[in-house]
Regions:
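Conserved positions in beta-strands of structured domains
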Residues: 22-25, 87, 92, 106-108, ...
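Catalytic strand-loop segment that frames the active site of acyl-thioester-processing enzymes
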Residues: 16-51
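HotDog/MaoC-like acyl-thioester-processing domains
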Residues: 65, 96-99, 108-140
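Hydrophobic beta-strand-centered segment that forms part of the acyl-chain substrate-binding groove
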Residues: 2, 65-104
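Active-site helix/loop of acyl-thioester processing domains in fatty-acid/polyketide metabolism
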Residues: 24, 51-75
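Hydrophobic core residues within well-ordered beta-strands of beta-rich domains
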Residues: 18-20, 101, 115
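Short aromatic-glycine motifs in intrinsically disordered, low-complexity regions
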Residues: 5-15
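Beta-strand residues in well-ordered beta-sheet regions across diverse protein folds
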Residues: 35, 104, 118-120
Length: 140
């Protein structure tokens, strides 16, 4: 199932202007493939380029999308998540406005509500960024 535009809000708790995922190509309990088309008015664009904080937020929201997919299939609202650790981030390039990013996030492990994920951000065939992120989801 593909989620676009406002359908994204069924998977992530973020709302404009901080939404950094505009399409979810696929998602399950283990991984997600997401996308973002970088607009000129994006708050993380400077001098025509999408900067590192935006890439990190995009990765975090991509991870939230696959966590949100689990709540979606159970008929629940997406949970608020908090980043606990970011490590091994490599930024190979800063994508320009108009770029269509495609990101794959993969669950490595989950223990007690804490998730560890690997992420790869691509622009066509170019590897834009990689990152390992640990986050936890707030229980209601």
């Amino acid at each position: 199932m593909i989620f676009r535009d406002k359908e994204i809000f069924m998977l992530i708790p973020q709302r404009p202007p901080i939404v950094m995922v505009d399409v979810v190509w696929s998602a399950d309990e283990q991984s997600a493939d997401t996308g973002l088309t970088i607009q000129e008015d994006n708050i993380f664009v400077k001098d025509g380029l999408f900067r590192e904080p935006g890439l990190i937020e995009h990765i975090a929201q991509s991870a939230a999308a696959f966590a949100g997919y689990g709540t979606f299939v159970r008929g629940e609202e997406p949970k608020l998540g908090f980043i606990g650790e970011i490590k091994d981030c490599v930024f190979n390039l800063m994508p320009p406005v108009g770029s269509e990013l495609r990101t794959h996030t993969q669950l490595v492990t989950e223990i007690g509500g804490i998730r560890l994920i690997n992420a790869e951000v691509r622009l066509k065939d170019e590897l834009v960024a990689t990152c390992v992120m640990k986050f936890f989801l707030k229980d209601d």
